[in-house]
């Protein structure tokens, strides 16, 4: 048996670019999500401004059970949040919080859980296929938006 893993990815688009280019917002998102997950920040948050050719902000904190990261892309108005933990947490609370805090509509917030096997080397192809299908859906939605 391997250590339990809880890994959720939240991607949102169609946000106000000015909102996403805010270091204080990213800092508060990291701190608030750690509290929502009932975990303690033991390193960070580290907040870094993007480059002119790739504007946005990245934030990262180490929590007592793993990490939380955020990447904003202010140009296209997108944000990616990744929470990886060895302790269970309620992803719906995080989803609800992000919807409210980022002022994003439900149709523009995509999230999924990465499922890990109970035994090393025993990934379920169905679970991987689901994640792949969801990622393809997101790519299609993005390409439709850009067209």
PLM region spans:
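Polybasic/polar functional segments that serve as interface/processing modules
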Residues: 1-147
């Amino acid at each position: 048996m391997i250590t339990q893993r809880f890994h959720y990815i939240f991607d949102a688009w169609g946000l106000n670019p000015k909102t996403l280019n805010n270091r204080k917002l990213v800092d508060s998102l990291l701190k608030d999500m750690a509290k929502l997950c009932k975990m303690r920040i033991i390193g960070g948050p580290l907040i870094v401004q993007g480059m002119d050719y790739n504007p946005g902000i990245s934030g990262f904190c180490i929590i007592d059970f793993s990490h939380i990261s955020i990447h904003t892309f202010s140009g296209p108005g997108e944000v990616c949040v990744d929470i990886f933990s060895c302790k269970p947490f309620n992803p719906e609370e995080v989803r609800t919080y992000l919807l409210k805090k980022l002022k994003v509509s439900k149709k523009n917030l995509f999230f999924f859980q990465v499922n890990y096997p109970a035994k090393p080397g025993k990934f379920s192809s169905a679970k991987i296929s689901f994640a792949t299908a969801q990622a393809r859906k997101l790519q299609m939605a993005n390409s439709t938006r850009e067209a």
